[in-house]
Amino acid sequence: QLAAKITPQTAAILYIKSHHTVQKSMLTVAEAAKVAHAHQLPLIVDAAAEEDLTAYYQADGDIVIYSGAKAIEGPTSGLVVGKKQYVEWVKRQSQGIGRAMKVGKEGILGLTLAIEQYLTATKETGAEMVSRMDKFLKDLNTIAGISARIVWDAAGRDIARAEISFDEKAIGKTTYQIMDELKQGNTAIY
C-alpha cells in the first residue's frame, strides 16, 4: 500500500513512530525503509517522544528526529540522528524557515547534558516497576470502591502502569469529584 502512494513528486517517506498510538498491522521502520529505498527515497522517522536513540537508525531509517524535551527530559530542543547527507541538508536550515525556533547555546548545552544523563541512567524494567507499585496497589485495593491493577504498555514497551478505577456508587462521589479532591491535597495529585 505504501509503494502504491509513491509518485514522481514524492521526496521522502515520513514514518511516525509514537507510543501514544498502538501501531498494529503497520509496517515496521525496517519494512518502511525497504519500500523507501527500493524507490530511491529517504525514510524520515519522527520518533519525537520515543526512548530508544539507536533502534530506528539501526532499522535503516535515514534520518531520525527526536524531541529533546520528551523522553530525553532536556530543554525545548530536538535531536537529529542519521546519514551524513541528510543531516547536512537539515543543517542548511540555519537561516530562513524555522529560524525563530532555533535552539540557543544554553539549550544545546542543556540537551547535551540531558543526553549524557539519559544514556548513562539505569533504566527501570517493567518487572521493577511492578515490584515498586505492588504494595501501593494492594493498599488501594483494600479501600471500598477502589480497584487498582497493573496494566502493560499497549505499544509493547516494557512499561507497567497502575490503572485505578472508582465505583462511584460505592464511594458516593463521582470520579471528577475525587480527582478534584486529590488536586486539593497537601500533595496535589493530578
Q: Where does each model-flagged region fall?
A:
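Anionic-ligand binding region
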Residues: V130, D134-K138
